[in-house]
Structure formats: C-alpha cells, structure tokens
Amino acid sequence: SGSGKSTLLNMLGCLDRPSSGKLYLGDDDVAQMNDDQLSYIRASRIGIVFQAYNLIQQLTVVENIEVPLIYQGRISKSDKQRCVELAKMVGLGQRLDHRPTQLSGGQQQRVAIARSLVNNPYFILADEPTGNLDSKTTYEILALFQQLNDAGKTIILVTHEDDVSRHAKRVIRLRDGLIQVDQRHEQERFDEVPMAVALAAVSAL
C-alpha cells in the first residue's frame, strides 16, 4: 500500500494523465489526448484483466468475450468466430454457453483473459489477477500468461506475491512512488503446451 501501484496502473491504462512530462503508447503521446481519444486507446490497444474478473453475469462465456467489440460498435461474423477461438485457446471450448455462475474462479479468469485479447492489444495489464484464486489455479493462470508472453504478447502483471513475480522475466519493485528494483532474471517455467501457434491463428481471423 502506498507504493504508487494504483497511480502507475492508471497511467499505463490511460485512465489518468501525468501532471507533467510525456507518456507514449507507440508513437502517440497519450498525455495530450482528450477523454474520447483515451477511451478509444483503452478499447483498442490495451487489454485489462481484473482481480474480480468483472464478467457480466447474464452473458455466456463467448458473449462476455465479445463485450469490448460491442462497445466499439462492431461485431461481425468473423469477430464472433474469433471470440469462440479465443475461448477454446484458454481451455473453455466445452463451456462456450456457460454463464459466470456456472464457472469456477479460474475459469472466470480465463474468460477475462480471452476478453482482454479480443482486440489484439499492444499489451495486457493484469491487476492482481490471481488474488482471488487458490494456489493450484494461480499456477494455471500464470502458466497461461507465460504462454501468451512466449507467443509475443507483453504482459504487465501487478502482484504483492513473490511466488507470483518469480515467474516473470522482469521484476520492478515500487516503494513510495519510486522504482527500488528493476531486474531481469531467469523465470521459473511451467510444463505447459506452448500456444504461440494457436494465438497466431486466432490473431489472423
């Protein structure tokens, strides 16, 4: 608490603007954008995964994955197929028509991860994504993030847990709003099937 995590998350997620300086996402200085422009950036370039999943209870797995597309006013036949393929990619191929109340916590977080990928974002911002999960399910979700990273997707994951951070390639520690540690190290690996080919196929839809 008080480390500056929330401020950093809000900056990276384009929810807040810096009081001075510049903040670039690609070639764009988002610090100079208006609210409508920032809303578009959030919807099209940033995937967000929350600790509490934030799924819509009345919608199915596939319909929840479709939500960012609906907010953008587009949902074509190919978009719908992409959502189905994303659900399958995260291991929910047998639960496409299930609603959140019919899913475990880990399964709900898999829906949230698939939803974060639907617009093929520049990066995924994950805020304590394993905070509500047991240890076994935590490792399953971390393995999924690791596979996505292996497939070329940047993951920015916030955690208080050393057991979680040791699975990252790079660890940045904050204290009182300042970076105390910024180090790269050999990450602990999971014995999972790589999904690079699957993610590439979904992105091509």
Regions found by a protein language model. Name each.
Residues 1-167, 174:
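ABC family nucleotide-binding domain
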Residues 115, 127, 199-205:
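Generic hydrophobic, helix-prone segments enriched in Leu/Val/Ile
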